[in-house]
């Protein structure tokens, strides 16, 4: 079957790889000259199934109000009063209760765990290299309340069979030695030993090269103008002056998927702006071993080979991609506080990207209201964590194979009535 994939980020390229493995004739289209130049370019680098959780959680509405008056708040909202923003925020608010949180986190962990397994199998099959580490991830708590609140997530982890370790402040240095110097600032941590890290952009480009060798065609530097639809079927993709025709189509354009589909149906995918710093590594002993996640500021600090990636923040500001110096201040503050000697922070590169977020945190993976159009978008802050699993799942669905995990609750049907 001829399949066109819109988007060459980590989700689109992973989907292309798995579809090619099923024998499909795959073409990937993207407006950028190379794969992984937008949201996949500078993310935090963590592959963290156990930390997969929706931003819509009990207490978030009240926290959001408090964060409005804090200098280093992890979430900032700039209302533009557009229907898209207001509708998305209202739907998110409706998911901020304990029942929805438990349901949403459980299915996110299910997909993320599956994705981690798919990545490990891909690594065994291909030997792909992307500065990956299998050292687990560590969530750091600065208050006793954060430490106590971890029991809510631990219950979901236990139900999903995800191994974990709840550590006191004195045990943190046993897994992240450099934290010994700042232990007095922390109350403890939650460690997930099976989580991983790696450079998402490097992975995506390596996988794209392997996909090309497997027969996937990449049409890069092509702007998708619109879908051509007749009845309930997509009949082509208009790119500049070229119409590209296939038997099936996959929408993997992240936050931009919403606008391309709006003429036919709405999907609740909205951009959540994030930031990162990439710092040259100066001292191994003063740097993290893997990934640590500061729960207070929602900032992750990840070790690559000779670089440190510091990523986080969330701004609800539409499609604005300006670099906000205040966000750099927050990222620098967190890394200076925890790893002050890891590298020359003043030499860091500063990046921003738009994560495609759904109100309930779960991506849209599967069929759409158009018969031959499939969705693989809305992964939010977890695109790298969920990419391989989402790609394999979508390839199975499109190929009329039974998915290896429950997938019905991942489709857009939970929103489109």
UniProtKB/Swiss-Prot annotation:
FAD binds at residues 3-17. Pathway: Amino-acid degradation; D-alanine degradation; NH(3) and pyruvate from D-alanine: step 1/1. Its cofactor is FAD. It comes from Pectobacterium carotovorum subsp. carotovorum (strain PC1). Its EC number is 1.4.99.-. GO terms for biological process: D-alanine catabolic process. It comes from the Bacteria. Oxidative deamination of D-amino acids. GO terms for molecular function: D-amino-acid dehydrogenase activity. Belongs to the DadA oxidoreductase family. Keywords: FAD, Flavoprotein, Oxidoreductase. The keyword Disulfide bond does not apply. SUPFAM superfamilies: FAD-linked reductases, C-terminal domain (SSF54373), FAD/NAD(P)-binding domain (SSF51905). It is an enzyme of class 1 (oxidoreductase). This is D-amino acid dehydrogenase. It catalyses: a D-alpha-amino acid + A + H2O = a 2-oxocarboxylate + AH2 + NH4(+). GO terms for cellular component: cytoplasm; plasma membrane.
């Amino acid at each position: 079957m001829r399949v066109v994939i819109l988007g060459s980020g980590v989700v689109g390229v992973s989907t292309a790889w798995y579809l090619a493995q099923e024998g499909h004739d795959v073409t990937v289209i993207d407006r950028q000259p190379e794969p992984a130049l937008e949201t996949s370019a500078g993310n935090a680098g963590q592959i963290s199934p156990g930390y997969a959780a929706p931003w819509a959680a009990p207490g978030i509405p009240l926290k959001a109000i408090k964060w409005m008056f804090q200098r280093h708040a992890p979430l900032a909202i700039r209302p533009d009063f557009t229907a898209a923003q207001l509708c998305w925020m209202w739907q998110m608010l409706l998911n901020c209760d304990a029942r929805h949180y438990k349901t949403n986190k459980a299915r996110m962990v299910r997909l993320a765990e599956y994705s981690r397994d798919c990545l490990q199998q891909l690594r065994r099959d291909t030997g792909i290299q992307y500065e990956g580490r299998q050292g687990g991830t560590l969530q750091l708590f600065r208050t006793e309340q954060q430490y106590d609140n971890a029991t809510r997530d631990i219950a979901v982890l236990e139900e999903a069979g995800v191994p974990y370790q709840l550590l006191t402040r004195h045990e943190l240095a046993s897994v992240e030695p450099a934290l010994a110097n700042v232990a007095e600032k922390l109350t403890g941590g939650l460690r997930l030993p099976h989580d991983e890290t790696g450079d998402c952009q490097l992975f995506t480009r390596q996988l794209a090269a392997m996909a090309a060798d497997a027969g996937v065609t990449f049409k890069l530097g092509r702007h998708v103008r619109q879908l051509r639809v007749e009845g309930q079927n997509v009949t082509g993709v208009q790119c500049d002056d070229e119409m590209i025709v296939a038997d099936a189509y996959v929408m993997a354009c992240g936050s931009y998927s919403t606008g391309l589909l709006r003429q036919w149906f709405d999907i609740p995918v909205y951009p959540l702006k994030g930031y990162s710093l990439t710092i040259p590594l100066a001292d191994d002993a003063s740097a993290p071993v893997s990934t640590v996640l500061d729960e207070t500021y929602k900032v992750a600090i990840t070790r690559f080979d000779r670089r440190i990636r510091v990523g986080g923040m969330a701004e609800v500001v539409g499609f604005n991609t300006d670099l906000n110096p205040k966000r750099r201040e927050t990222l620098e503050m967190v890394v200076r506080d925890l790893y002050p000697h890891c590298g020359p922070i003043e030499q860091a590169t500063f990046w921003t990207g738009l994560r495609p977020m759904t109100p309930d945190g779960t991506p849209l993976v599967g069929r759409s209201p158009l018969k031959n159009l499939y969705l693989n978008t809305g992964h939010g802050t977890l695109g790298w964590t969920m990419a391989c699993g989402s790609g394999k799942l979508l390839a199975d669905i499109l190929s009329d194979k039974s998915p290896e995990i429950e997938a019905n609750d991942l489709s857009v049907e939970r929103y489109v009535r």
